[in-house]
From Swiss-Prot:
Main localization category: cytoplasm
Keyword Coiled coil: no
InterPro entries reported in the protein's UniProt record: PCRF, Pep_chain_release_fac_I, Pep_chain_release_fac_I_sf, Prokaryotic/Mito_RF, RF-1
A GO CC term attached to the entry: cytoplasm
Lineage: Bacteria, Pseudomonadati, Pseudomonadota, Alphaproteobacteria, Hyphomicrobiales
Name of the featured protein: Peptide chain release factor 1
Top-level lineage group: Bacteria
Record note on modification: Methylated by PrmC. Methylation increases the termination efficiency of RF1.
Key words, A-Z: Cytoplasm, Methylation, Protein biosynthesis
Bias (Basic and acidic residues): 285-309
Function: Peptide chain release factor 1 directs the termination of translation in response to the peptide chain termination codons UAG and UAA.
């Protein structure tokens, strides 16, 4: 085990005592109370992990002392020797739990997310695959108790989506979906293929943390807002009022378009929310890319041009190329049932990279 500096743990315990005292004396103003309460809530979990780790450490030290004691009672030494493996395992688990809780936190992990799926190479088959991916994430979200709301969609001519953008609302959505960003590839025999040949097509997925107004400031003077009539598949107008909204952020060139609601006011609110999320994500991506380059991270780099996963239908196989994980559970993954197996493996690898970067591996 890589030692965790005791002075670092002592500093956390001291800070916990200070925050507790500041909240107890009642002198803090309302704003400070909110911040201190949030900090205390975060520190409580860390302090519990520290106490658990130190208790396990002391327990193992006591057992080792009993075994090594010259002239000690043979029966007690034998009993201690029996207890030693279990105590070592308990310390290992407490050490691992403490390491993970000390890792730098991604402030966006607790947020809801914006999910964008776009058909890539492969024509109609790519659009169908984009639709399959959207259903996979929708089913996964349902299993987690999250809510999915489509912001904008452009249907493919043979079904599926050329593009679909949705909000996924719930606690810690981004922490689970953020590793899905990238290029997804499918290998299967299309229904229209008479020779039984396998075709390859692709779709790209982008997952953004849903930004709130406090996360990023958007200057109204930097916006170009256009209204227009909503359009359906094929480009025809589907209503007579100009309810669709397109907002262009002039400094960055970021454009968002929303037409799902009949109300222009609601579409504008959704478009602003989507724009904030895109601008917030651009800031995060720049910072994350620099950090990822420093540690040569394979997981969580956020590179959306990277081919991250292949879905091979003839073999019933899903392969995540970042961690060389292969599951022969294609149907279960596409149904959202086994997606956690992939995501859990990605989270574990990401944590290992962070531990190495922090010198705690």
């Amino acid at each position: 085990m890589t030692p965790i500096p005791s002075d670092r743990l002592d500093a956390i315990l001291a800070r916990h005592d200070i925050v507790t005292a500041q909240l107890a004396d009642g002198s803090a103003d309302a704003g400070s109370i909110v911040q201190l309460s949030r900090e205390l809530s975060e520190l409580d979990g860390v302090v519990a992990a520290i106490h658990h780790y130190r208790l396990a450490e002391a327990n193992l030290a006591g057992i080792r002392a009993m075994i090594d004691e010259p002239g000690g009672d043979p029966e007690m030494r034998a009993l201690a020797a029996e207890e030693k493996p279990e105590a070592e395992e308990a310390l290992e688990q407490a050490h691992r739990a403490l390491q993970l809780i000390l890792l730098p936190k991604d402030a966006a992990d607790e947020k809801s997310a914006i999910l964008e799926i776009r058909a890539g190479t492969g024509g109609d088959e790519a659009a169908l695959f984009a639709g399959d991916l959207f259903r996979m994430y929708a089913r996964y979200a349902e299993s987690k108790g999250w809510r999915v709301e489509v912001i904008s969609e452009s249907e493919g001519t043979a079904g599926g989506y050329r593009e679909v953008v949705a909000e996924v609302k719930g606690r810690s959505v981004f922490s689970r979906l953020k590793f899905e960003s990238g290029a997804h590839r499918v290998q299967r025999v299309p229904d229209t293929e008479t020779q039984g040949r396998i075709h390859t097509s692709a779709a790209t997925v982008a997952v953004l943390p849903e930004a709130e107004e406090v996360d990023i400031v958007v200057n109204e003077a930097d916006l170009k807002i256009d209204t227009m009539r909503a359009q359906g598949a094929g480009g025809q107008h589907v209503n007579k009022t100009e309810s669709a909204i397109r907002i262009t952020h002039i400094p960055t060139g970021v454009v968002v378009f929303v037409q799902e609601e009949r109300s222009q006011h609601k579409n504008r609110a959704r478009a602003m929310s989507l724009l904030r999320s895109k601008l917030f994500d651009a800031e995060r991506t720049a910072k994350d890319s620099a950090r990822a380059a420093d540690r040569k991270a394979q997981v969580g780099s956020g590179d959306r041009s990277e081919r991250i996963r292949t879905y091979n239908f003839p073999q019933g196989r899903v392969t995540d190329h970042r961690i060389n994980l292969t599951l022969y559970k294609l149907e279960e993954v596409m149904a959202g049932q086994a997606l956690d197996e992939v995501i859990d493996a990605l989270v574990t690898e990401h944590q290992a990279e962070l531990l190495a970067a922090e010198g705690m591996a």
